[in-house]
Amino acid sequence: MWDRSTRYGELAFQLQEEICSGPLSPGDKLPSIRALCARFQASSATVTHALYLLEDAGMISVRPRSGFYVRERFHAVERRPPARVPEPCLQPALPAQRALLRSLEVLAAADQPMLFARINPELYPAVALQRIMTEQARHNPAFLTGCLIGPDSPLHRQLARRGRIMGCDWHAEDITITLANYEVYRTLFRSLTQPGQTVAIASPAPMRLLEELDEHGLKVLEIPSHPEHGLSIDTLEFALRREKVAACAFSANFPHPTGGQMSDAGKRRVVELLAEHGVPLIEDDRNGDLHFGEKRPLPFKAFDRTGLVHYFSDVSGLVGHGLSIGFAVTNLRHEFERIAQPPELFQYTLSSFMASGLFEPHLRRLRQALASYSSQYQAAVRAHFPREARSFAVSGGHWMWIELPRGFDTTALLRRALQDDIAFSPGQLFCTDGSLNHCLRLNTGMPVTETVERDIAALGAMIAEQLTLMRSAPREADRA
């Protein structure tokens, strides 16, 4: 099944033997990557690659922040010898991108500042929020037992005021409070599309968005997006003339993973173009408040005159993800009546913080810190990466997109880097066909410490070494 001449193939085979006829039973947790490295005297890259193979074959699954487990359905009721076990290829295999993401999620608890799209938790106003939450719970015990929050709650009014700052003429009753997760995408995809239809997205795109589209049985039309200037409007216009598109899902301001920003003229043109074709737009504006400049950039929604733009954002991402509060502005509010909302105590805590006069100063400090971090990463990459590595100046967000020459394999680079406990996100996570595997994304939401600088320098040396091998490969072939 696997090439046992490779170290990772042999390791995958040995683990398969243990799953099929050895000590590992359905539901059992596999030893940690560190333990497997010690046991088999193998690098973390070799062990991780072997686990990729087993997961692709449907034999194991990963649970975020927990580890790898033997899949229940892989086994028959009785133990069978290896020869009688159904071939793993008969099991539904996960796409390569998803398997890779699941494997990387095992590192969630590890200190990997460049891997996950996270912001330094020290930048969040935890003390102020804790104080407000304690006061709210003491003076309003009904929040602890649950009370119904109507469309004219303090949080609705605060968000309506912020909408006017963003150039959006919405009112408290237009706003739906949501959990800060992908439930908004799920609800809007269910409402606006049918399985088998096509949704246009910017490419590169967040892996979670690609997963949602896949789970809804939707086809993906990838529109190229420049890491600095955003969506290619000419390509979108061409695609709309040739393809039947049920909906679009775009971000105008600092989208993950590139961090570009569209001009206001470009945003207006996109909204007008979609209105001409009657195509709804799902706008994810969760990063719009993370701008480095003085003025908050306008979202697509600010140019919407037809109601075709379905807007959502995540406020808790600005103050701490533990609150898990987002909101949507859409004419499909009735579709959200069946989904869960954040606890009332959390909602009133956030609205009190926003009304206290502390919110805007906090946002300024947060933006200044992220802008400083971004500059630190830019300087470190310029200093340590080879000149062939092209990074892009962004004006918001907390990630850096880096392009390497076509043909460069950043997934192979990741496996090499994991041997030194260095991790990043390879480009193939952010597209459907692996065409971005010459790119990578670094999280810049954490400061560049001495350790991070050392890791960037080591990663730059690995890139230079891999580029040298790429250049020598044609000459080797010519001599052969």
Enumerate the predicted regions with their spans.
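N-terminal basic, amphipathic alpha-helical segments
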Residues: M1-T134, L332, I339-P342, S351, ...
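Short beta-strand "wing" residues that participate in macromolecule-binding interfaces
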Residues: S61-R63, W170, F424
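Conserved core segment of the aminotransferase class I/II
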Residues: L129, R305-A371
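Conserved core of the PLP fold type I
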Residues: N140-H277, D289-L290, K295-L298, A302-F303, ...
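Conserved glycine-rich beta-strand-loop-beta hairpin in the small C-terminal domain of fold type I
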Residues: Q368-Q378, A389-E403
